[in-house]
């Protein structure tokens, strides 16, 4: 079980991400922005809604709207470990977080 910080102000999508991670046995804390995020094992960020840099030493998964190539590039340049389209995040939430933990 990992402590996962999910920064996603979208109530519906954030709840889906949180539910999938809890079902996989992870402890999840949701945030609307980066303020207050405190030493998680993994960071998950909605890149279209939040301007949050990855945390040093913390595996990070960012997701974006598939049409927003600029956001993907900025996240990769910022150092996110994994940057995936929102649709993939919806399908593979737990698997992506577990893969990030292996990095």
Residue ranges and their predicted role:
Residues 1-32:
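Short, charged N-terminal beta->alpha structural module
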Residues 11-12, 31-35, 47-51, 67-68:
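Short, polar loop motifs at secondary-structure junctions
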Residues 24, 56, 78-80:
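Short, structured coil segments at secondary-structure junctions
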Residues 39-46:
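Active-site beta3 strand of CheY-like receiver
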Residues 58-67:
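A short, hydrophobic beta-strand element within the central beta-sheet of small alpha/beta folds
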Residues 67-82:
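Alpha4 helix (beta4-alpha4-beta5 surface) of REC/receiver domains from two-component response regulators
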Residues 79-91:
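Output/docking surface of receiver
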Residues 95-103:
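Receiver (REC) domain switch/output surface
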């Amino acid at each position: 079980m990992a402590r996962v910080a999910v920064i996603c102000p979208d109530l519906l999508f954030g709840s889906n991400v949180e539910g999938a991670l809890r079902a996989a046995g992870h402890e999840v804390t949701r945030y609307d922005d980066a303020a207050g995020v405190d030493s998680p094992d993994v960071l998950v960020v909605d890149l279209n809604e939040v301007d949050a840099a990855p945390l040093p030493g913390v595996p990070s998964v960012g997701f974006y709207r598939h049409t927003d190539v600029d956001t993907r590039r900025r996240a990769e340049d910022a150092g996110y470990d994994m940057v995936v389209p929102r649709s993939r995040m919806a399908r593979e939430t737990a698997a992506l977080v577990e893969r990030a933990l292996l990095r």
